Amino acid sequence: MPLAQIPAAAYGPGPRSPRPDPSCRRQGERHFDVIVYGDEPAGVMTALELSRQLPRLAGLPRPRIALLTPSDLRAGLGGTIARSGLAYLDRNQVPRDMWAVLPPFAPSSDLYRRFLRLTGVQQIAVDPRQASRAFRRALARARITLLAGVEPTGTELERAAAADGGTLQGEGSDRLCVIETAGHGRLGADLFIDASLGADLAHRASVPFLRGLGPRGLSRESISLGWIFEVEGLSITQLRNLEEQLTRRLLDRRDREAQHWLVGWPAYRNNRQRLLADLVDQRGNPLLLYSATSDSADQQSPALSIAVHGEQGLAPGLRRAPARMDAANVAILPDRLSFNALLFRNSAAQNREVIARHGRPLGWMVPAAADVESFFLRHGARRVHWMPELYIRSADQIAHPRMALSAGLMARGGVPRPEALGTFSYHLDFRGGISAYVPPAKPTFNFGYRHTLPREVSNLAVLGPASGFGGLGQGAGRIIELNISVGQGLAIASALALARRLPLAAVDPREVARLMPAGFAPYGRPSGSTAFSLFLGRLLYQLESWFPRWPWEPGWHSPLAS
C-alpha cells in the first residue's frame, strides 16, 4: 500500500535510538512532554493536535501537554480572535484555475478544517465569544493543562553536546529546559513551542531576532495596528443605507458640510472624476457594502471613511495622521457587527511596546476610538464595544530559521513539494503600513514547518508572525490559517522527535509531509506561471488522490501492487 496509507502505529517509537538522550538534566518542578506558550489560535490548535499525535507517533498514551499564557483569560481564550476580536477571517484564496477541483476557500490543512468546525465558522465570520468557549471545552476534553497569568522571569538552558563529544544531527548549541515563572514555579519540558505573538519565550532563551520587517531600512517598519470594535443596533441593510446617504451628500455640491469633509482629501477635492470613480459604479449607483458570503461584507467605497474623518476634522492617511478609518471588513455575527477598520500608525519599536503590554491600547489611541464611537452612535447604533486588546499584525522574526519562508520563496512557489505540508494563497498584505511602497503580490505557495525552527535552540519552535519569514514574508505569515496549518506539521514533527529522541531539526520534513492527512495535496506554483503549467499543476493535484506519492519520490509504492 502507499506509504501515506500505512497505519500511524507503524511510525511509532520503535527501538530506542542509539543516539544520546537529548532531554535535559534539569526537569523543573513540573515537567511536561511539550509546553506550548501562548494562547493564539495556532497555539491552541497545535496543542490539540499534539494530544492526537503523541499517542499515535510517540507511544505516549497520556501525553503531558501544557498550554501557558501570560494573559488574563477572563477576557477570553484565543488571543487575536478572543481578545483582539478578529472575527473576519482571512481565508486561503484558491486560484481561479483550481476551482474545478477545490472550492474558493478550501482549507489549507485538516487542522484548519477542524478549527472551522470547532468554532462554528460557516464561511468567514467567527464569533470571538463562541470561539473562546469552544477552545476551553476542547482543551479540557484533551486533558491539556491550561495555566493563565504565566509571566516568564527567566529560562534555563543546557549545552546540547553529545556524550561522545559531538553534537546531535540538526541540533543547535543549546536546548531549553525550564521556564522560570512568577507564581507557577519552574516549568520544564522536552519540547517547547512558542506560539505567542512576540515570541517572548524565544527572546528569553536568547534566540536572535530580525527587527521590524527586515534588514537595513525595513528594520524600523511594522504593519499598522488595529483596534476592532463591535456595533450593536445596526444591520447590514441599515449600514448600506447610511453609505448611500453619505455618498449622495458627497456628490451634492450644495451640501456645504459634506463638501467641507473633502478638505482633508485633496486627491478627491481637486479631482471630481476620481471621486466619482471611487464612490459610484459605471451606472452611477453608489458603491455599497458587498457581501461575497452570507456572514461577511466588505466596503467598496471610502464614503464612510471620509465622513468619519470629516466630521471630526481629522486628516486621513497614516502618513499625515496617527489614525485612519480604513475600508472595513465586516463580520456579521448573530447579534452584532464586527468592524476591522480602525488603523493606527506603527513602528517596530512601538509594536514591541504594545506586545510587551499584552496588546493593551496606548493612551493616544483612545480619542480616535471615541470619535469613531460617537459617529456610529449618531447614525443609529445602540452600542459600540471596543475589544480589550489591539489587533497586532506583525512582530520581530527569528533571524536564523532552518529554512526561511520568505516573500521570495513564496513567489517561487514555496518549499519543495516533497516537504510541503500544504498550499496557501493570499495577498502579501501590509495594511496601512508600507503598502504604498511594496508592489502588490498574491503568491500561491507550498509551506512547511522548518521556518519555525531557530538554529540556536534545538528543542524550540516559534509559531506565528515571529517565525522565520525573512522580513516581508510576514505579509502572509501573519494569517491565522497559515499558522494553524503549519502547526499541524509541527505537531507531527514534535511527536517523531520525542519518539526517536531527536532534536526537531533532525526530523526528516519529507516524512512529516507524508504523515499529513490526505486531501490537502500541495499545488504551489511560481508567480506568473503560464497557462500550460497551471493546467499541468491542476492535473497533478487530481492525480494525487490516486497516487499519494510519486514514483520518483523515495519510498514510493504503487497502489496497483497493494
Question: Where would I find each of the regions flagged by the language model?
Answer:
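Conserved N-terminal/central alpha/beta ligand/cofactor-binding core
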Residues: P2-P15, D21-S23, E29-H31, P55-G154, ...
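Flavin (FAD/FMN)-binding glycine-rich loop and adjacent Rossmann-like elements that form
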Residues: G12-P18, T80, G185-L191, S196-G519, ...
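Second-shell loop/turn segments in exported
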Residues: H31-V36, W99, L118-V126, G188, ...
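N-terminal Rossmann-like FAD-binding beta1-loop-alpha1 element of flavoenzymes
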Residues: V34-P63
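Soluble non-cytosolic domains of exported or imported proteins
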Residues: E40-P41, A125-Q130, G477, E481, ...
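Mobile, glycine-rich extracellular loop/lid and propeptide segments
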Residues: P41, M45, E151-T153, L191, ...
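Stable alpha-helical elements in mature extracytoplasmic
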Residues: A42-G43, A131-F135, L197, L201, ...
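Conserved beta-strand-loop-beta-strand element in the redox core of flavoprotein oxidoreductases
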Residues: E156-R186
